[in-house]
């Protein structure tokens, strides 16, 4: 928000460089690189911030489409947001969705129609956790967390009669047990703990929910742009 405001109010390069020095404690070369990076983003499009979620539509080679969310909330929050949005897109358009995340954003990619903004707007403070929980089903993330929880609760054994079970065998047995538990009781305590670890430890569902609440309350705006080539901030994600 600070950098965007300085560009909008026409601050000089020297003034912005001084702000970068005070804010980051970097040398001249690094400060100039940061300045030029932001100049390119501001000139070509818009600068995202903690008050603005920037959504960028970009069409790649062939019919591959990208929806890039410039969300500056950290990898764990972006992981949660991306999974929830991708789940809605996959279910609504019956398509396979590719996800890539970073500390400063994430993208969804698919062949054909990809309603990223429309899917994101379906997320509310009331349904977000439920949708994210549903998106974990049949994922390697939940299977891995469940295997660890099952091992700690002695549902599966790493050693039996003095022999160590291979990781591969533990993974196979863990997935079989997970499928059985999901069919038997979706509220099984070990399954609930595996979901909790995935949502709260592996991801950051609580702060992701705060982002949804900020948007719902009008405290964070959403801006969309269409680009022929990705913006400078998007290159690290799509390249």
Where are these regions (language model features)?
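Extended, highly charged accessory segments
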Residues: 1-239
């Amino acid at each position: 928000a600070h950098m965007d405001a300085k560009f909008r109010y026409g601050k000089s390069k020297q003034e912005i460089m001084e702000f970068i020095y005070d804010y980051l404690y970097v040398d001249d070369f690094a400060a100039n690189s940061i300045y030029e990076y932001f100049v390119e983003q501001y000139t070509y499009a818009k600068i995202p911030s903690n008050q603005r979620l920037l959504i960028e539509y970009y069409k790649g080679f062939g019919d591959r489409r990208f929806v890039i969310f410039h969300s500056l909330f950290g990898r764990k929050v972006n992981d949660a947001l991306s999974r929830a949005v991708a789940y809605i897109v996959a279910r609504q358009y019956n398509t396979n969705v590719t996800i890539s995340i970073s500390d400063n954003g994430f993208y969804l990619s698919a062949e054909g129609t990809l309603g990223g903004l429309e899917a994101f707007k379906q997320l509310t403070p009331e349904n977000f956790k439920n949708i994210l929980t549903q998106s974990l089903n049949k994922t390697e993330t939940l299977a891995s967390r469940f295997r660890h929880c099952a091992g700690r609760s002695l549902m599966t054994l790493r050693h039996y009669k003095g022999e160590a079970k291979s990781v591969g065998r533990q993974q196979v047995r863990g997935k079989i047990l997970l499928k059985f538990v999901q069919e038997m009781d979706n509220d099984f305590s070990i399954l609930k703990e595996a979901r909790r670890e995935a949502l709260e430890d592996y991801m950051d569902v609580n702060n992701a929910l705060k982002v949804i609440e900020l948007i719902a309350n009008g405290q964070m705006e959403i801006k969309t742009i269409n680009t022929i080539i990705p913006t400078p901030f998007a290159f690290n994600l799509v390249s």
